[in-house]
Amino acid sequence: MSEKPLLSKDEKRLLKIKNRMSRKRVEFRRQEWFRYKKFNESWRKPRGKHSKLREHLGYRPPVVDAGYRSPAAVRGLHPSGFAEKLVYNVNDLKSINPDREGARIASSVGMRKRKEIEEEADNLGIHVFNRVVK
């Protein structure tokens, strides 16, 4: 089983930047999420005419912006650097490139089939993200 993906120097550098950005990224919350019970914390763009949050006033929390996005070359990759592929059965493992991709076993897969998938992944040298703890 390959522990690390084959990445170029540039991809490794961008992955480090992405992981650092992810740690620093603030939690974007909806305007006045604390005020009303019916408001979830999940982000909603402020659209009010006099909204201080929409106007990006400094004493307000940060607003979602393109500058918080991770580098395009490594966007969507697992923090380890592997691209995730969802696997439902043993046949799905055949389409995975073990040098660049890892497998995530679907939540709907039962324990018996999960063990079969993990054994076959070990034989093929494929990294499984959500292994059953032994």
Curated annotation (Swiss-Prot):
It comes from Picrophilus torridus (strain ATCC 700027 / DSM 9790 / JCM 10055 / NBRC 100828 / KAW 2/3). GO terms for molecular function: structural constituent of ribosome. The gene is rpl32e. This is Large ribosomal subunit protein eL32. The keyword Zinc-finger does not apply. Keywords: Ribonucleoprotein, Ribosomal protein. PANTHER family: 60S RIBOSOMAL PROTEIN L32 AND DNA-DIRECTED RNA POLYMERASE II, SUBUNIT N, RIBOSOMAL PROTEIN L32. Pfam families: Ribosomal_L32e. The keyword Ribonucleoprotein applies.
